[in-house]
């Protein structure tokens, strides 16, 4: 059909909607294909010939991998051929949001190019050095390497942690991986600090992988130990609250290594937030606390000469005084400087907001990105087409039936809510702690569900038994949320701890996390203290446990459910 006066042919609608044909990309040996895919778009990548890997995990030949909201790189040691094509858009944000237009690059990527200068050989040398340390540690009967990765924001710390973990699992190792960065979740939601034993490969499409779910999974699920921090930066409140949770996590990791010979031999890989690599405030004190608590043996510094110089001055060739096996063998700390990859890009606030929302949505609903790995399995009704979906449950509860604690530390731009009169160390003489706890909570007799929420491990120590308290003072920054329910509860998360609803504040802080629930709506005029509409990963009654409000972080997530 011709348009009047222009004599231009108009393409049929079907032709305009047809996606472009896939493109083949040939990578020479020792190079990598770097690509960025926006949230809402998908890019499909298939390895046609040769060998390739994504952050240390090898790609399978003729297997299609689908990526969305990703900034990554596929590296080849010996050369390979990739097929790259655009996939179907996936929904992001509230229902009815406009689809995101595809990018100008191959496969709808926002940016994509081939890079021949990469630090992968350098990273591989680090892996082989760690393997040598593991062999030596096994022969000497001591712990394997405890690796701390430091660097500024967007320097490639998490990518290096994935590479070292992927290479270790490929060698049959079972390293413990610790995430100390609250800005992103590892097998959990943002705001959580986690530790996980990796016994199998890392999921290429999902990053680290997924936590337990009801239903099949193409990649074996991981069992994370989760503690909730609930603040955006580790230096909020001078870092004392953050250090207390780090100590608790270190106790759990040390206990696991003492009981698990495979984990002890493989060692620990620790990813850290970028803010402590920028030399701000109490960052050096936080680094020293991590080094001491985890008995760090190797410090890897990426992308900062200043930080490397400081670490060499403070730690290089210094004895590991806190480790009994290190003291017996005179083991010393090594500080290594690594090259920052040219593929590292800055992630702006908008992108990180999408990352957090995507992790929270995936926790409750599964991944909306189609996966051929999932479709290759005989999946149950929990899958729609080739998309792995989960089925969370909604319920309504009275606000007064829950024991909810709010974090009082002020973040940047907020006024401090800290009130010393709420804590035991400031109570008048003769005032008992049990009386204080009783006055803080008003709970009904609810029974926890028989199933476990994602992130819960039944063998974890309870909040009141097992490990000693990590705190050295009783000034824990929590306050009980009074009735009636504030409207600001809507669209936020609650972290369900393994602490009793009338536990002390230190016990609430030191308790591991059973799982998370989402508050979809608050009706302050109904029920006792208000009515809350909740979204939970499993059905049944809400567990009768103390809960921590994630108002400050990860903050408000609007439109998770209608």
Swiss-Prot record:
GO (cellular component) term, any one: mRNA cleavage factor complex
Disordered: region residues: 1-27, 415-483
InterPro entries per the UniProt record, alphabetical: Clp1, Clp1/Grc3, Clp1_C, Clp1_C_sf, Clp1_N, Clp1_N_sf, CLP1_P, P-loop_NTPase
Biased composition (Low complexity): 445-479
Subcellular location(s) per record: Nucleus
The UniProt record lists the keyword Plastid: no
Keywords associated with the record: ATP-binding, mRNA processing, Nucleotide-binding, Nucleus
Residues the entry annotates as binding ATP: 32, 71, 154-159
GO molecular function: ATP binding; polynucleotide 5'-hydroxyl-kinase activity
GO biological process: mRNA 3'-end processing; tRNA splicing, via endonucleolytic cleavage and ligation
Alphabetized Pfam families for the sequence: Clp1, CLP1_N, CLP1_P
Function description: Required for endonucleolytic cleavage during polyadenylation-dependent pre-mRNA 3'-end formation.
Family matches, as HAMAP family: Clp1
Subunit structure: Component of a pre-mRNA cleavage factor complex. Interacts directly with PCF11.
Protein family according to the UniProt entry: Belongs to the Clp1 family. Clp1 subfamily.
UniProt protein name: mRNA cleavage and polyadenylation factor CLP1
Primary gene name: CLP1
């Amino acid at each position: 059909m011709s348009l009047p006066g222009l004599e231009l042919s108009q393409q049929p609608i079907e032709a305009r909607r047809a996606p472009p044909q896939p493109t083949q990309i040939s990578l020479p040996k020792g190079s990598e294909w770097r690509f960025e895919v926006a949230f809402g778009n998908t890019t499909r990548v298939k390895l046609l010939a040769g060998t390739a890997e994504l952050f240390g995990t090898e790609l399978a030949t003729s297997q299609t991998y689908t990526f969305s909201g990703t900034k990554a790189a596929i590296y080849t040691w010996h050369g390979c051929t990739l097929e790259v094509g655009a996939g179907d858009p996936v929904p992001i944000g509230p229902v009815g949001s406009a689809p995101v237009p595809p990018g100008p690059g191959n496969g709808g990527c926002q940016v994509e190019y081939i890079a021949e200068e990469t630090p992968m050989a350098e990273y591989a040398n680090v892996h082989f050095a760690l393997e040598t340390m593991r062999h030596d540690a096994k022969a000497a009967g001591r712990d394997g390497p405890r690796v701390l990765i430091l660097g500024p924001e967007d320097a490639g710390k998490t990518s290096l942690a994935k590479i070292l973990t992927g290479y270790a699992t490929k060698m049959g190792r079972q390293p413990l991986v610790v995430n100390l960065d609250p800005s992103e979740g590892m097998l959990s939601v943002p705001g959580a600090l986690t530790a996980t034993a990796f016994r199998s490969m890392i999921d290429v499409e999902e990053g680290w992988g997924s936590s337990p779910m009801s239903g099949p999974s193409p990649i074996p699920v991981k069992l994370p130990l989760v503690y909730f921090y609930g603040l955006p930066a580790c230096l909020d409140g001078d870092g004392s609250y953050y250090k207390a949770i780090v100590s608790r996590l270190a106790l759990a990791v040390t206990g696991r290594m003492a009981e698990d010979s495979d984990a002890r031999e493989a060692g620990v890989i620790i990813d850290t937030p970028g803010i402590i690599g920028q030399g701000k405030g109490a960052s050096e004190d936080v680094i020293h606390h991590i080094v001491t608590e985890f008995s760090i043996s190797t410090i890897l510094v990426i992308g900062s000469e200043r930080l490397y110089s400081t670490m060499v001055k403070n730690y290089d060739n210094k004895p590991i005084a806190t480790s009994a096996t290190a003291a017996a063998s005179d083991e010393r700390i090594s500080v290594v400087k690594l090259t920052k990859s040219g593929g590292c890009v800055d992630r702006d606030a908008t992108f990180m907001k999408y990352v957090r929302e995507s992790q929270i949505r995936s926790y409750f609903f599964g991944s909306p990105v189609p996966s051929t790995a999932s479709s290759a399995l005989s999946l149950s009704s929990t899958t729609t087409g080739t998309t792995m979906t989960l089925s969370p449950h909604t319920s309504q509860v009275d606000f007064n039936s829950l024991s909810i604690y709010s974090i009082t530390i002020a973040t940047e731009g907020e006024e401090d809510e800290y009130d010393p009169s709420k804590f035991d160390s400031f109570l008048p003489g003769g005032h008992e702690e049990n009386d204080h706890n009783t006055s803080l909570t008003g709970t009904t007799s609810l029974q926890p569900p028989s199933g476990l929420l994602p992130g819960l491990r039944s063998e974890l120590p309870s909040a009141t038994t097992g490990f000693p308290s990590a705190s050295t003072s009783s000034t824990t920054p929590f306050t009980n949320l009074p009735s009636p329910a504030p409207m600001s509860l809507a669209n936020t998360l609650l972290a369900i701890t393994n602490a009793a609803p009338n536990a002390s504040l230190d016990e609430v802080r030191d308790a591991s996390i059973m799982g998370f629930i989402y508050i979809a709506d608050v009706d302050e005029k109904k029920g006792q203290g208000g009515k809350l509409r909740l979204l939970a990963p499993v059905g049944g009654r809400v567990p009768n446990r103390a809960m921590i409000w994630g108002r400050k972080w990860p903050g408000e997530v609007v439109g998770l459910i209608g």
